[in-house]
């Protein structure tokens, strides 16, 4: 049982490093690569390419949600149906319609369903329950905040009472309670890649994976793993905290911490302007670019829609003309 951090700036080849290591051991040992949901298909494709399209019998790209589904089927507890995002929105809309006369702010607009849904998602991700909200509502002296919190408490309570399903965050809670009983991840090698950070739920799951797996490897986008006190002076502030928190988790559970892998050679930024920007953005002291920039442009948009339209038109122009 060990933890190894693989780190380097953006474009240093952290994912490539993982794919190459996996390809060397493909079908020799059980390997899992955990990625965010939106990266799963791309990761599978890249892994197949690195493995020369060999059958990946003992190697698998997986997400936390897919992992939860797998463990639930193995251990049990799959009686409740998963609640989709649209199903969650419909349920919240129904609750909002019934509770609108008791709410101070949230009942005035049906569009607040999105705000309520996103808030409940964040609460569950970071282990904030109804009692935590009540405690905050009782202690705050800001009446505006108190009223908004009371609205959210009402919606959260009704949501928990009404729900006969499992939403995406409940699934991870169940995974967290069941994963140590699972045999699927024992003595395996795990790579965790492409995450910009982890929620409280995910940290807890990773801590348990450290106790099960032979080795857990995590990629982190940062220039070093030294703690930085001033977030305004370090673009990698949050990422460094992620690395430090993982190290502390490993120490807490008596997990061996292997030597870090630091990658320094930039592969992605062949353009000198972008390379200079990446190296000096937030750097103290910074270096001034001596040449006139030709590949970096600034555009002040009125809103996100005009920003997207401008970017799309620029892409079309570059593809057609350059």
Residue spans of the language-model regions?
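Structural preference for long, well-ordered alpha-helical segments in enzyme cores
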Residues: 18-22, 47, 95-96, 156, ...
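Structural recognition of the conserved hydrophobic beta-strand(s) that form the central parallel beta-sheet
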Residues: 33-35, 61, 191, 215-220
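Extended, H/D-rich, highly charged conserved domains that either
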Residues: 197-265
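Accessory N-terminal region flanking or inserted into the helicase ATPase core
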Residues: 2-6, 17, 96-194, 201, ...
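Helicase P-loop NTPase motor core
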Residues: 1-4, 10-29, 37, 179-180, ...
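Structural motif
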Residues: 7-10, 35-39, 192-197, 221-222, ...
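A general structural motif
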Residues: 1, 28-30, 185-188, 213-215
